[in-house]
From Swiss-Prot:
It catalyses: cytidine(1402) in 16S rRNA + S-adenosyl-L-methionine = N(4)-methylcytidine(1402) in 16S rRNA + S-adenosyl-L-homocysteine + H(+). The keyword Plastid does not apply. Residues 368-380 have a biased composition (Basic and acidic residues). One of its GO terms (cellular component) is cytoplasm. Belongs to the methyltransferase superfamily. RsmH family. Gene3D superfamilies: Putative methyltransferase TM0872, insert domain, Vaccinia Virus protein VP39. This is Ribosomal RNA small subunit methyltransferase H. It comes from the Bacteria.
């Protein structure tokens, strides 16, 4: 892992790098910029605040956070060295407040250890392939142009999309097409790939697009855009282990948050969004049995959800940036003092069981006598030491 690579990438950028950075920034509009900034900002309004953008990309969200918070220190991570190079130029005015790290996001813990940071105040994820990668034909992410089948977010990674196509078994290809591409015709496409590669290995995206088009029903070819898009998504996710990286990164990111710290995640397809939704829901839920009158220490919610469902871009942004259409934003705040003591459970009225004496139909309400007992494992006066006992 290369820590603090800012000087290095600036030194290697060469003539024209700043111009390329400005051009790329102009073409790459940061998705849900205002909403992402607002959801993170309350954790950054204090001296010495530190945030991590673990998928820095072109640095659009990072630039806005640094602009709004003059005392903020930012750690920017990305697995794509080209993105780091361009982001270094875009963020040059904040050079004394940023540290750039060449790493996949699941290397967050190691990166913070190397920088001597035990906790941070905010962590931001902007998942999926970037506009920069889609627009660079030689990267092989786009099915709209004929190019080499690469799809590596980090060009130094060992496995390309061509390697997957030419070496995976029929069952492996079927699995990734079905699971990662949600492709209904996965077995048929996998069979065609195995058959065609025996004649000649796959090297170009155009040949793969033609193969997919020839092996899906005519009705599918006429609707829903390019029929190869699901196959390309599946290959990209497999080559970069995108879902595995998300699953490994989120727990590390939350554990490194300071109390009141905030975690925000932008997703762009249902597979990664499902992982994020489940992880954040688990953090914001109690693991105690629902019938207990108190929440035992260690089983209470660790986070508060800051977004209702997956928030989406508004109509004005969609008109300006169609790529924002699939974006979903989810965020949580780490609760202070979570997991340290037991606390009384408050059960919403809608979840209370119908019992005699609660005023339900057929059971006239009668006065209840509140009795209290001391929890055996807590000292009197501690939060949660006294709980209501239902007679």
């Amino acid at each position: 892992m290369d820590v603090d690579v800012q000087d290095d990438v600036q030194g290697r950028a060469g003539e024209g790098a700043e111009e390329r950075a400005h051009d790329a920034a102009r073409r790459h509009a940061s998705v849900m910029l205002e909403r992402c900034t607002r959801v993170l900002s309350p954790a950054l309004d204090h001296p010495g605040a530190v945030t991590v953008d673990v998928t820095l990309g072109m640095g659009g969200h990072a630039h806005e956070l640094l602009r709004r918070h003059p005392g903020l220190r930012l750690v920017g991570m990305d697995r794509d060295p080209q993105a780091l190079e361009l982001a270094a130029h875009r963020l040059h005015e904040f050079a004394d407040r940023i540290t750039l790290v060449h790493s996949v996001s699941d290397g967050l813990g190691e990166a913070l250890d190397d920088l001597g940071l035990d906790t941070v105040d905010a962590v931001f994820f902007d998942l999926g392939v970037s506009s920069l990668q889609l627009d660079e034909a030689e990267r092989g992410f786009s099915y709209a142009r004929d190019t080499a089948l690469d799809m590596r977010m980090d060009p130094g990674a060992p496995t390309t999309a061509a390697d997957v196509l030419n070496t995976y078994s029929h069952s492996q290809l079927t699995r990734i097409l079905r699971v990662y591409g949600e492709e209904r015709f996965a077995p048929r496409i996998a069979s065609a790939i195995v058959r065609e590669r025996a004649l000649e290995p796959f090297t170009s995206s155009a040949r793969l697009v033609d193969l997919v088009r020839a092996n899906v029903p005519a009705a599918t070819r006429r609707t829903g855009g390019n029929p190869a898009k699901r196959t390309f998504q599946a290959l990209r996710i497999e080559v970069n282990d995108e879902l595995g990286v998300v699953e490994r990164s989120l727990p590390v990111a939350f554990e490194r948050l300071a109390p009141e710290g905030r975690l925000a995640v932008l997703t762009f397809h249902s597979l990664e969004d499902r992982i994020v939704k489940n992880a954040l829901r688990e953090l914001s839920s109690s693991s105690a049995p629902p019938d207990l009158p108190f929440v035992p220490a260690g089983s209470g919610p660790r986070a508060e959800l800051l977004t209702r469902g997956g928030e989406t871009a508004d109509e004005a942004e969609l008109a300006e940036n169609p790529r924002a259409a699939s974006a979903r934003l989810r965020a949580v705040r780490r609760l202070p003092g979570e997991d340290r003591v037991s606390s009384p459970r408050v059960v919403p009225a809608s979840r209370r069981r119908n019992r005699p004496g609660t005023g339900t139909a057929g059971n006239p309400a009668r006065p209840r006598t509140q009795e209290f007992e001391t929890h055996p494992h807590l000292e009197p006066g501690e939060p949660g030491a006294t709980v209501e006992r239902t007679p």
